[in-house]
């Protein structure tokens, strides 16, 4: 699911939803769900400060469902309220909804920062947003480019190529 909670940058959600579906298929996650929330620089800066203790906005944040309580889960994702808080960070089996879908977590993206990166990298905003979605999904799966000695970067490069994002 793609949610747009910002108004600064015009974004077509449907192509991003189709891309997200394609990423999930490519990674064998067709029975998994996640939420991508497009938000303002101010909102993502608040989350960045609260959860990473870093000042200022960032391009993408990921909140894996199994590892931590997501600030987005109670408001927007299929897991709401007490059920989300109760199941977060217990190290148990992934919560399966009645449909058999595993909820992976939430990704927050700043389209304003994505637009700046798109200009810098000389590519369309839509491509930059897709790159950030892919990056966020890999974080939801447990990859961490800051600690995994290049494993996430290698996988991301390979997937970018397969998904036409090079």
Give the residues covered by each predicted segment.
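An acidic/histidine-cluster motif and surrounding catalytic segment
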Residues: 1-130, 138-166
């Amino acid at each position: 699911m793609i949610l747009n909670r910002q108004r600064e940058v015009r974004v077509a959600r449907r192509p991003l939803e189709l891309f997200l579906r394609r990423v999930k298929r490519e990674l064998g996650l067709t029975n998994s769900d996640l939420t991508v929330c497009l938000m303002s620089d101010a909102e993502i800066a608040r989350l960045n400060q609260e959860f990473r203790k870093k000042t200022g906005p960032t391009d993408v944040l990921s909140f894996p469902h199994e590892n931590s309580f997501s600030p987005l889960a109670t408001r927007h994702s299929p897991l709401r309220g007490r059920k989300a808080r109760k199941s977060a960070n217990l190290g148990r089996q992934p919560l399966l909804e009645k449909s058999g879908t595993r909820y992976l977590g939430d990704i927050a993206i700043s389209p304003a920062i994505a637009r700046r990166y798109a200009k810098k990298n000389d590519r369309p905003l839509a491509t930059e947003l897709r790159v950030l979605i892919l990056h966020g999904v890999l974080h939801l799966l447990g990859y961490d480019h800051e600690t995994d000695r290049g494993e996430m970067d290698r996988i991301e490069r390979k997937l970018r190529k397969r998904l036409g994002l090079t």
